[in-house]
A protein has these predicted regions:
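Sec-dependent bacterial lipoprotein signal peptides
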Residues: 1-20
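Bacterial Sec-dependent N-terminal signal peptides
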Residues: 16-42, 405-418
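Conserved catalytic region of serine esterases and O-acyltransferases that act on ester linkages
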Residues: 24, 92-142, 244, 249-453
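Catalytic nucleophile-elbow at a beta strand-turn-alpha helix junction centered on a G-D-S/GDSL motif
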Residues: 43-57
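Extracytoplasmic/secreted proteins, especially bacterial periplasmic and envelope-associated proteins
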Residues: 45, 63, 67, 71, ...
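Active-site-proximal beta-strand/loop segments in catalytic clefts of secreted hydrolases
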Residues: 46-49, 184-189, 197, 232-236, ...
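A structural motif corresponding to the C-terminal end of an alpha-helix
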Residues: 77, 176-177, 212-230, 324-345
């Protein structure tokens, strides 16, 4: 597997900062959970890489055991919560920071891990599969590898083969455990694939998502009528660091006036999004207008050549993705109402994080890449700390719906991620690299460093 490597910028922002801590969940002295009208004895989770605990480009046990689903099971007092455990250094090997000045992030030199409990005779309680969509949950034809994309994605196939293990569909394996509580988190990959490709991948139509989601819910109602439910909304993926890190404009070296980057259709508009995968192009001056300041690599003058369509999400494409997210969330909200399920508003939590930030013990955590504390090094997936916030969001929703009294996760266990004192002033965005230009350095990033999970 090719090493995923990139150099990053503005190292001064990171000096003195602490990185997110990882580790096993320790016992917390808290009041015992009271289940109210719910039953958490056999909790099974369905979902995508978010629920699986994918972080910084891969799966590894010390992050899988910090996923919101794992934390919820711990807090709610589930009898067990098995996961498809992955040894260090992860599958694929996780990204890491090797240098702060300049910031150097890579998985080079790391050893691929392995799935360590494939022989478990029962299905896992965490049946979330990275790359999966709601269709994959009910698909009975390609259930062990998912519908092969064109060209095939070996990581996608690897995840299905090692988590589903040819034991039946995801839904069949969930229902076969006699679940008393199920959480469902689908919809992100239906839109993330289109968004992360610059909208080069077609969106799943809202009516089709609605029909498949309804099929999933109908089967659960029929074959697991005893199960209480928590349904998770779809976050607006256009607000995550993968889409918000690079501004669509720079400044003129001669006048200091703002000038637009060059996209496939000409100058970018203020609402256009430059994807993180454009980093390698920007580093050699592509996308930077002639005479414009290269905020990624000042040593490489702008050459005026346009960025590729796959590196830019224009305002119309962003609006289409946001519309699809809204439609999916309408489906999920309606399903929660019909089923009497708890609704976990992950979309609302991300909206709060990307505007005012999330607050804990005097610190503010935000969605800024690396420095914000909420997103891992792949720019897409939550950190351990963010999973703690999500777990508490789920706990609040379940407590309110079922009259339960589940104690919150102690966020202090994960709150060593970059804190508010290291944030650039919010008013300085979206051009944090213009200041202190002598501290900037080149970026080199393979175009496939991040794909929809």
């Amino acid at each position: 597997m090719n090493a995923r490597t990139f150099l990053w910028i503005a190292a001064a922002l990171f000096l003195g900062g602490a990185l997110a801590a990882c580790g096993k969940i320790e016992a917390i002295t808290q009041p015992a959970a009271q289940s109210g009208n719910a039953n958490f004895r056999t909790y099974v989770a369905m979902g995508t890489s978010i629920t699986a605990g994918w972080e910084s480009g891969g799966l590894v046990e010390h992050h899988q055991t910090k996923s919101y689903a794992y934390l919820f099971a711990h807090q709610a007092g589930a009898s067990a919560f098995t996961i498809p455990s992955v040894s260090a250094d992860g599958v694929p090997p996780l990204l890491r920071i090797l240098s702060l000045n300049p910031l150097f992030i890579t998985n080079a030199g790391r050893t691929p891990g392995a799935f360590t409990n494939l022989g478990q005779p029962t299905s896992y309680h965490n049946m979330a599969v990275p790359y999966s969509t709601v269709f994959d949950a009910v698909d009975s034809i390609y259930y062990y590898t998912a519908i092969p994309p064109n060209p095939p994605n070996p990581e996608r196939i690897l995840m299905f083969e090692n988590i589903a293990r040819h034991r039946g569909t995801i839904l069949q394996q969930v229902l076969g455990q006699g679940p008393t509580f199920i959480s469902i988190e689908y919809g992100s990959n239906e839109v993330l694939g289109a968004a992360s490709s610059g909208s080069g991948t077609p969106l799943l139509s809202p009516p089709l998502f609605d029909a498949i989601y309804d099929t999933l819910m109908a089967n659960i109602a029929r074959f697991a009528p005893q199960a209480n439910l928590a349904l998770v909304t779809v976050p607006d993926v256009t607000t995550i660091p993968f889409f918000t890190t690079f501004p669509p404009y720079t400044v003129s070296l001669t006048t200091g006036a703002p000038v637009s980057l060059v996209g496939p259709d000409g100058p970018l508009a203020p609402a256009d999004l430059v994807l993180l995968r454009a980093a390698d192009s920007l580093a050699i001056g592509t996308g930077i207008p002639v005479g414009g300041y290269n905020y990624v690599n000042p040593a490489a003058p702008g050459n005026g050549r346009p960025l590729l369509d796959s590196q830019v999400l224009n305002a119309l494409e962003s609006a289409e993705i946001q519309s699809a997210v809204a439609a999916e969330n309408t489906t999920i909200r309606d399903a929660a109402t019909t089923a009497g399920a708890a609704l976990v508003d992950l979309n609302g939590l991300l909206r709060e994080a990307s505007t005012t930030g999330l607050h804990y013990q005097g610190h503010t955590y935000a969605t800024d890449f690396v420095t914000g504390g909420l997103f891992s090094l792949d720019g897409v997936h939550p950190t351990d700390l963010a999973h703690g916030f999500i777990a508490n969001l789920m706990i609040d929703a379940v407590n309110a719906k079922y009259g339960a009294h589940i104690p919150h996760v102690n966020l202090s266990e994960s709150a060593t991620a970059t804190s508010s004192r290291l944030q650039p002033a919010r008013g300085s965005k979206p051009m944090p690299w213009i200041q202190g230009a002598d501290r900037l350095c080149p970026i080199v990033m393979p175009g496939d460093v991040i794909a929809a999970r």
